[in-house]
């Protein structure tokens, strides 16, 4: 399901499972001399409950998120994402600010022209690549403000940051869709290009419920949306936030996100504020400074330290492939990679990263 149904009998099983994890984890940690715990995730009940109990007992907890080789959880930062609210303060202390911004500018411009960098290596194709339907119009061009909503995958961790205005992505969508008619805008929706297949049924149901809302093809190039003169972009915490802002587009976020320390996008703190800006787009006043976006980009994707090592942010970008379970040769290929010493530096890299966070 894309959101919680309090009448769903499966919810009871989830709660029982969570309680089982809680009491089992607590008993084990209280009766064994555990010093450190390594988790693949810091969210979802099978990981987050164990991690939080461990932290309450003074046990070190580590995760391996996308942005860092190693991330160390703390009681005041339980999520797997970097401490992005400190980005500005950290950057201010750097001596080569201009060089760092130059580095960001090159990579960011390459991304916006269709290249996939290591920061978005999870994308199968670039969302800014030119497509075969480039002559088709995105907006109706009816004189109304042009607004695009970028959907998230409904099943992909809506709570990886500290908080969000809505309980989940589905409630955000319902909130916006139910107000589109009153907004009186030229409105389009783009599904997430990497969304899980289960999203398709949800989207079809939304189309039936809101027949007047126009959905784009999920592979529509973001470049085309920008070129048609979009006035406002809606996202909860997506990378499109800083990418569209770099083109001077106003962006309305709906939750804590990596750009929260900066002022090039707008983040309301309540549903009431969010609704106000939806209904009054002309009241959104932003001073978008490209250098701020370049600074953010450097801190989020390129900066060394706090669990990130030299060589950018993805240690395992040695040989990018889709991990398809039907590919029976996948593990043989990994063994072949190891035989030519492609992974020899992995343990040294982890040691360096752990030293940084400890």
Language-model features, listed with the residues they occupy:
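Conserved nucleotide-sugar donor-interacting segment of glycosyltransferase catalytic cores
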Residues: 21-76
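Donor nucleotide-activated moiety binding/catalytic core segment of transferases
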Residues: 13-30, 141-142, 168, 195-242
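Conserved nucleotide-sugar donor-binding subdomain of glycosyltransferases
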Residues: 1-36, 109-126
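A donor-sugar binding/catalytic signature common to diverse glycosyltransferases
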Residues: 46, 219-266
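Active-site-proximal region of nucleotide-activated glycan assembly enzymes
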Residues: 52-128, 273, 280-285
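Conserved catalytic-core segment of nucleotide-activated headgroup transferases in glycan assembly
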Residues: 113-205
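Long, C-terminal catalytic modules of enzymes
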Residues: 143, 264, 268-358
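Gly/Ser/Thr-rich loops at beta-strand to alpha-helix junctions
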Residues: 40-47, 194-197, 241
